């Protein structure tokens, strides 16, 4: 153990010397070599499934999860591909494999540490405040530690690792949503939950700063979904007071304001980091508005006129029931998931994720926008057809 520890210490000391190299601060076209991903179920491509007790598997271990594209469960929290999958395809990469439990996986073009149920803050910190959750103990800090410990296996030398990190698109989430979800679901009031926001933002910022110190150059940092449009929250906070609902979307206005509160603070912190590290590209992914537009104009995007009910759940006005246990009760699903925005009441369908990814990659929901002008014509041709497949 001591020998391994000293090897890791030596590795990072050498790596840090390479990270002192001056980087051109001029904006450059984004031509990535790989994807490094952290986050929760929005980006999890199989990590929670790999970490789970075989006698108590999560719902993503079973159909109908994965039915649309893969035709079998993969550990993804959807009927098909996720935003991270569409990003990988857009860049001409294979789908990013999960890190945990992967045997003989090829991480040359990407590695994913995102885990379903993960939080930004440490589990012990949340539990001290009465916020309990059963799913995972893999916080953002744990994911980052796993990444650092894996570097000697992902690259052959400190200079090679620096090159890999510098030329990767680093996807920082979405992360933090579960910190709020768990707090809401145990009955914390809005003011108590607002107190978590600066702590979540600080945790995300610290992780970005640490990765910058390791050579990270381009970060895609998503904001929160509009919680007031979430089927889970619409079911939990259902009310007869029509004034609480947005008349256009049917979303709960006060919950969407909370999401906006988080996103405003996150963007302010990202702006601070960008000024502090002008040689780094920090891109904000506006998950809030790219998803909200699907509720505002569902027909425009091919969805049913009432887009909020879940495709695949267990009844109720929004086809969703809180508290369903792992692996229990196979839900009844809609005939055509491509017509629905919400998959299971918490996560989106592949159709919704495709449109969200397109809004981030092609605009206008990435701030600042990506510059893809230097990509090869082969990849550009793939991009032109990707979103229609």
UniProtKB/Swiss-Prot annotation:
Chief location bin: secreted
Top-level division of the source organism's lineage: Eukaryota
The keyword Protein transport appears for this protein: no
InterPro entries (alphabetical): GDSL, SGNH_hydro_sf, SGNH_plant_lipase-like
Keyword Nuclease: no
Signal sequence annotation: 1-25
Its EC number(s): 3.1.1.-
Subcellular location: Secreted
GO MF term list: hydrolase activity, acting on ester bonds
Enzyme class, broadest EC rank: hydrolase
Active site positions: 41 (nucleophile), 344, 347
Glycosylation sites: 137, 319
Swiss-Prot/TrEMBL GO biological process terms: lipid catabolic process
Keywords tagged on the record: Glycoprotein, Hydrolase, Lipid degradation, Lipid metabolism, Secreted, Signal
One cellular-component annotation, GO: extracellular region
Family membership: Belongs to the 'GDSL' lipolytic enzyme family.
Name under which the protein is recorded: GDSL esterase/lipase At1g28570
Phylogenetic placement of the source organism: Eukaryota, Viridiplantae, Streptophyta, Embryophyta, Tracheophyta
């Amino acid at each position: 153990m001591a020998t391994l520890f000293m090897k890791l210490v030596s590795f990072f000391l050498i790596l840090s010397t390479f990270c002192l190299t001056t980087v051109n601060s001029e904006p450059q076209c984004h031509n990535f070599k790989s994807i490094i991903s952290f986050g929760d179920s929005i980006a999890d491509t199989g990590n929670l499934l790999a970490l789970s007790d075989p006698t108590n598997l999560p719902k993503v271990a079973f159909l109908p999860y994965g039915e649309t594209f893969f035709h079998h469960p993969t550990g993804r929290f959807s009927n098909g591909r996720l935003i991270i999958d569409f990003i990988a395809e857009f860049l001409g990469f294979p789908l990013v494999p999960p890190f945990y439990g992967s045997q003989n996986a090829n991480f040359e073009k990407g590695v994913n540490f995102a885990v379903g149920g993960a939080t930004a803050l440490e589990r012990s910190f949340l539990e001290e405040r009465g916020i309990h959750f059963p799913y995972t103990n893999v916080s953002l800090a744990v994911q980052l530690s796993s990444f650092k410990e894996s570097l000697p296996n992902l690259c052959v030398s400190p200079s090679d690792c620096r090159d890999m990190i510098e030329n990767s698109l680093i996807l920082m989430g979405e992360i933090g949503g579960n910190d709020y979800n768990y707090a809401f679901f145990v009955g914390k009031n809005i003011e108590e939950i607002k107190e978590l926001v600066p702590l979540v933002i600080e945790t995300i910022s610290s992780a970005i700063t640490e990765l910058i110190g390791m050579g990270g150059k381009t970060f895609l940092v998503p904001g929160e979904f509009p919680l007031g449009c979430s089927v889970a929250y619409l079911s939990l906070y259902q009310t007869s007071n029509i004034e609480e609902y947005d008349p256009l979307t049917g979303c709960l206005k006060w919950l969407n304001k909370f999401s906006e509160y988080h996103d405003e603070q996150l963007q302010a912190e990202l702006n601070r980091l960008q000024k502090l590290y002008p040689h780094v590209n920090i891109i904000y992914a506006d998950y809030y508005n790219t998803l909200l537009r699907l509720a505002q104009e569902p027909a425009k995007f091919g969805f049913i006129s009432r887009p909020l009910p879940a495709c695949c759940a267990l009844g109720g006005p929004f086809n969703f029931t809180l508290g369903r246990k792992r692996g229990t009760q196979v839900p009844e699903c809609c005939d055509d998931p491509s017509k629905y925005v919400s998959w299971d009441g918490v996560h989106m369908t592949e159709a919704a994720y495709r449109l969200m990814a397109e809004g981030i990659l092609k605009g206008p929901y990435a701030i600042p926008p990506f510059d893809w002008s230097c990509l090869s014509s082969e990849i550009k041709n793939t991009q032109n057809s990707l979103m229609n497949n």
